[in-house]
Design a protein with these regions (language model features):
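Gly/Ser/Thr/Pro-rich low-complexity, intrinsically disordered segments
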Residues: 2-450
């Protein structure tokens, strides 16, 4: 078959930057109307197209450079704005971000990789300032004109307690409890006649019982004189245990203290206790410590146990007459003691506001009301979508709202955990969310009458 291609091939490249190809056959001159001018025009078209492609590539390159330059300027401006802005909202969350990163054992780089050291130092100096200001501060109950209530009467069977319930459990909204009792009847009275309500596991149905402050009550245990309140906020989820009899609260240590810590559940079980939370900090290089070597002194039942000497943190102690004290040195009448800081509430005065250099973290705190109730609180954190953590200022406000007269921070982070009646009722941020980490000791609540 004869070749049907036109002797004049005018092939255009379809891809950007491909050269234009023009093929000229001399036989085309035989066509009617063909002239030298026509041939020159065809050859000129190829030249014009190459120039046009060249100009297009140049304009595209300039446009790309312009976009990249604008993006770089935008990102640089945004970075400077976020790092140095004094707008309250920006400054608050920048501060919390820095404090939170620097408050971890192994994630300082989250701040140091992006933020100038002078900005980090400025933020963290507020923490150092507070620690310096708290030196020399000690609890004093001399201004307390309110007599402690005999909370041993809070531990009675329901038929004996019912008429005086609001005296010993004044934090409970009676109407909401009455509605619960009407709905559930005798099912919430145990075999010995004690009122026992336990919906403390995450995901359990809301009891509908509220405190007088409006928070959900998940546990009401009149056998042991314990109320557990669920704490919920925009960034946090936790539990606060109100223990009626301070005499039931003590410090218990790992059996292998000095060489290895234990899970809180094991410490609680070995002492036949009903509840426990973590207490002392411990030597923890790169987050791999085994909880054996505690920071600061540990006193349990009047006896000094092993612990690092020379610790500058506050001494948190319970006296023989069941008063919680915070001081620089152990009081002579202390029966239980550990060390940590900072002090949150001292003699009824709030000492911490906002993040104050400690950021958003999992927290554990111990406190006591003026009338003698103990407050053991754990707030979960570092778990996106569930609980990020809480600032010390916000936690102080919660304790203050519930009448804390003394309160001090305990070791937090991945060590924070509350164990009650055979299981964890908060979630550790460690690899083992139910058991948490090995710790040197715990604040425990003994079973009533034991």
């Amino acid at each position: 078959m004869a070749d049907q291609r036109d002797p004049l091939e005018y092939n255009w490249g379809r891809e950007h930057g491909k050269r234009l190809h023009v093929t000229y056959d001399e036989s085309i001159a035989q066509r009617p109307g063909f002239s030298e001018h026509t041939a020159n025009g065809i050859e000129g078209a190829g030249y014009d197209m190459k120039e046009r492609q060249k100009r297009l590539r140049s304009r595209t390159a300039k446009k790309t450079i312009g976009i990249l330059a604008a993006l770089l300027i935008f990102l640089s401006s945004t970075y400077c704005f976020l790092i140095y802005s004094n707008i309250p909202f920006i400054a608050k969350w920048r501060t919390i971000y820095i404090e939170t990163a620097m408050g971890t054992m192994t994630h300082h780089w989250l701040a140091e990789a992006f933020i100038p050291q002078n900005v980090i130092d400025q933020v963290m100096n507020s923490r150092s300032t507070i620690e310096e200001e708290q030196k020399g501060l000690s609890s004093s109950w001399s201004t307390n004109t309110e007599e402690a209530i005999d909370y041993t009467q809070a531990v009675r069977p329901w038929d004996q307690l019912k008429s005086e319930f609001t005296t010993y459990y004044s934090e409970i909204d009676w109407d909401t409890l009455k509605s619960y009792l009407q709905k559930h009847g005798s099912s919430c009275i145990d075999s010995d006649g004690y009122l026992y309500i336990d919906e403390a596991d995450y995901g359990d149905e809301d009891t509908g019982i509220r405190t007088t402050k409006g928070d959900p009550v998940c546990v009401l245990d009149t056998r042991n004189g314990i109320v557990i309140v669920t704490l919920k906020g925009d960034s946090y989820y936790g539990k606060m245990a109100l223990v009626k009899c301070a005499s039931q609260v003590s410090v218990a240590a790992s059996d292998a203290l000095g060489s290895e810590g234990e899970f809180i559940q094991d410490i609680v079980k070995s002492h036949d206790a009903i509840l426990g939370i973590n207490a002392s900090g411990f030597y923890d290089p790169n987050g791999t410590g085994n909880g054996g070597e505690a920071y600061g002194m540990i006193f349990s039942n009047g006896k000094r146990l092993r612990g690092r000497e020379g610790c500058s943190m506050k001494v948190i102690s319970l006296s023989k007459d069941d008063r919680l004290n915070v001081s620089d040195k152990k009081p002579s009448d202390a029966r239980e003691a550990v060390q940590f800081d900072p002090v949150l509430i001292l003699d009824g005065d709030l000492l911490i506001s906002g993040s104050s250099g400690w950021g958003l973290q999992p927290r554990s705190v111990i406190g006591q009301t003026r009338d003698g109730q103990m407050m053991l609180t754990v707030v979960d954190g570092r778990q996106a979508g569930y609980s990020v953590g809480i600032t010390l200022g916000d936690l102080s406000d919660i304790l203050y709202k519930y009448g804390a007269y003394q309160a001090c921070n305990l070791d937090g982070g991945s060590s924070s955990l509350m164990y009650y009646d055979g299981r964890a009722i908060t979630s550790s941020s460690s690899a083992d969310s139910e058991r948490g980490r090995h710790v040197p000791d715990a604040w425990i609540v003994s079973k009533a009458g034991s």
